[in-house]
């Protein structure tokens, strides 16, 4: 049996007593987890205790900071860039909206370093899709940074940067339930963007995740839940918690706020990675349906707001124009060509 630091048992005891950890305590715990220094049985107990108690913003921020501190380095640029990402796990199996939106946003002139992984609940996560487009998931950090500089978009595949997460995998797979790891992915982009649009699988997470981002020093961000989706919705209302200079502003958006009509959720259903590749190719070359195009455009529109373009209707039209011109699809091919 491995020898574990007494501090880890003290932290575990707090969790068993349903007491919240400080950000520092959470950092210490997750630092040990990522280094493989926590026995799987104890790991199972602390993840479950955290889940039943309910993870606080300080605990999530501490865990995220530990994972970032242990991540492989990425040469972050001085200029402003963003991530657009969902937790996944909403169970809706829609097309890959945030991945598609990353290319469209880049075609609109902003920079996006997207952090992602293979599918959790959908048949096709962002990495599954990019794989089908021939984009190299194992791109070196330097090559990815070059793509961000030159194309305005790059993709950082989580396992390439966060190898320590593997220590928690057997426990997560055995537990078969959501744990804190399900919300950590979008918060541990190794490029450390200061701007982020993050979708969450449950509306109860919107405010806590926004508070987590404030604790992590995020400059301008929005956390959204769209009527069951971890994206801005075109089939109903979207709850938004926007962060501006450390303050959180909560509001609701409808498709009309973007100048669009409402579409049924069925209109943006996805499939296997190969089917999704065909759908996304259509969307990025201006051949998608109005619903598909709209679903991507509203997410790009809110991301552009985080860069200071406040007019959502104008942003939506700009995003639609980037799809119809084929400019966004060119970026997919250029990223694939970098190898």
Curated annotation (Swiss-Prot):
Can you cite an annotated GO cellular component? cytosol
Provide the coiled-coil residue spans: none
Instruction: Give me the residues that bind 5-phospho-alpha-D-ribose 1-diphosphate, please.
Output: 86, 89-90, 94, 96-99, 114-122, 126
Relay the cofactor remark from the entry.
Binds 2 magnesium ions per monomer.
Annotated Pfam families: Glycos_trans_3N, Glycos_transf_3
Lineage: superkingdom: Bacteria
List required co-factors: Mg(2+)
Among InterPro entries, the record links this protein to: Anthranilate_Pribosyl_Tfrase, Glycosyl_Trfase_fam3, Glycosyl_Trfase_fam3_N_dom, Glycosyl_Trfase_fam3_N_dom_sf, Nuc_phospho_transferase
Catalysed reaction equations from the record: N-(5-phospho-beta-D-ribosyl)anthranilate + diphosphate = 5-phospho-alpha-D-ribose 1-diphosphate + anthranilate
Write out the entry's keywords from A to Z: Amino-acid biosynthesis, Aromatic amino acid biosynthesis, Glycosyltransferase, Magnesium, Metal-binding, Transferase, Tryptophan biosynthesis
Q: Which residues cross the membrane?
A: none
Q: In which residues is anthranilate 1 bound? A: 86, 117
Provide a GO biological process annotation.
Answer: L-tryptophan biosynthetic process
- Matches recorded under Gene3D superfamilies: Nucleoside phosphorylase/phosphoribosyltransferase catalytic domain (3.40.1030.10), Transferase, Pyrimidine Nucleoside Phosphorylase, Chain C (1.20.970.10)
Q: Where does Mg(2+) 1 bind?
A: 98, 231
Sites binding anthranilate 2 sit at 172
Binding of Mg(2+) 2 occurs at 230-231
Q: How does it assemble?
A: Homodimer.
Main function: Catalyzes the transfer of the phosphoribosyl group of 5-phosphorylribose-1-pyrophosphate (PRPP) to anthranilate to yield N-(5'-phosphoribosyl)-anthranilate (PRA).
Family membership noted in the UniProt record: Belongs to the anthranilate phosphoribosyltransferase family.
What is the designated name of this protein? Anthranilate phosphoribosyltransferase
Specify the species.
Answer: Photobacterium profundum (strain SS9)
């Amino acid at each position: 049996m491995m020898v574990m630091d007494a501090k880890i048992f003290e932290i575990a005891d707090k969790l068993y007593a349903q007491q919240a950890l400080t950000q520092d305590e959470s950092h210490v715990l997750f630092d040990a987890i990522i280094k493989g220094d926590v026995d799987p049985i104890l790991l199972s107990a602390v993840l479950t205790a955290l889940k039943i108690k309910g993870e606080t913003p300080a605990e999530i921020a501490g865990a995220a900071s530990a994972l970032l501190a242990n991540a492989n380095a990425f040469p972050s640029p001085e200029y402003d860039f963003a991530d657009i990402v969902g937790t996944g796990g909403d169970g809706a199996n829609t097309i890959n909206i945030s991945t598609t939106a990353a290319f469209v946003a880049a075609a609109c002139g902003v920079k996006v370093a997207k952090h992602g992984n293979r599918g959790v609940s959908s048949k096709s996560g962002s990495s599954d899709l990019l794989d089908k487009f021939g984009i190299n998931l194992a791109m070196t950090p330097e090559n990815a940074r070059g793509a961000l500089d030159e194309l305005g978009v790059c993709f950082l595949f989580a396992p390439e940067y966060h190898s320590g997460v593997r220590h928690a995998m057997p426990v997560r797979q055995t537990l078969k339930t959501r744990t804190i790891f399900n919300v950590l992915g979008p918060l541990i982009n190794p490029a450390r963007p200061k701007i982020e649009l993050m979708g969450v699988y449950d509306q109860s997470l919107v405010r806590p995740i926004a508070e987590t981002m404030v604790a992590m020093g995020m400059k301008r961000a929005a956390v959204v839940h769209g009527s069951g989706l971890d994206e801005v919705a075109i089939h109903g209302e979207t709850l938004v918690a926007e962060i501006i200079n450390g303050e959180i502003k909560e509001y609701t958006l409808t498709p009309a706020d973007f100048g669009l009509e409402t579409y049924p959720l069925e209109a943006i259903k996805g499939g296997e990675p190969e089917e999704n590749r065909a759908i996304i190719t259509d969307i990025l070359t201006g051949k998608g349906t109005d619903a598909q195009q709209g679903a991507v455009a509203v997410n790009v529109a809110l991301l552009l707001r985080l860069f200071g373009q406040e007019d959502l209707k104008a942003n939506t039209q700009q995003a639609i124009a980037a799809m119809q011109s084929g400019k966004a699809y060119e970026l997919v091919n250029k990223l694939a060509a970098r190898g």
